[in-house]
Amino acid sequence: RVGVAIAHNPFGPYIPEATPLEGVGGIDPCIFVDDDGQAYLVMPGITITKMNDDWLSVSTDPADRHRVEEVPTKGLVEGPYLFKHNGKYYMTFPWARDVEEVLAYCMADNIFGPYKFMGVFFEEHANKCWTNHHSIIEFKGQTYLFYHHNDYSPAFDKNRSVCADSIFFEPDGSIRMVKPSLRGIGVTQANKEIQIDRYSEISQSGDSIAYLDTTNYFAGWKTVFYEKNAWAQYN
């Protein structure tokens, strides 16, 4: 079930409502607020439902509820995330395409569709970790993908660390493939030391990322070059 907690300050304290939302079942809800101020609840499945003005209930009018049909029929387990960019609606979602999850998406001109399945924009993690649950935020003109991974806990992927990478779009609005970079986001001042594990791009072979201390994963990473002419680029 999905519950609601209310606070008068973003930092709380939050007071939970006595009962969960009526007519809503499942996990990993997403709230999307359109340009006109109308809020929608997005749930795995994938369904989009108008929220009432109190934000404590959803509309029971069938016309205010839409199931996105233009998605894979299997492997939709959790966490859809809806966002808007340049007037287009992007329904993004984790998809267990084979075994592990990728991130895929659909696009539409209207919130209730019809949507067009666009494919994958974030591949499975190399170590087969199921940690693609994500959100997408635009800040100061740049769009960012937030997700989590088990870089600090490879033996137990439930101890997940937050990751962020930039998202870029093609001229037709489609999302370019996002590759985890370990670079992080933001701009490094020219007079600051650069952490060399944070690369924008690396050569296809001859280098890798390793832990500074294999007994203490929180010590950070290093870039290891083991072939001539291997390189790492930081933008």
Can you annotate each of these PLM segments?
Residues 1-234:
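Carbohydrate-active catalytic/glycan-binding domains of CAZyme proteins
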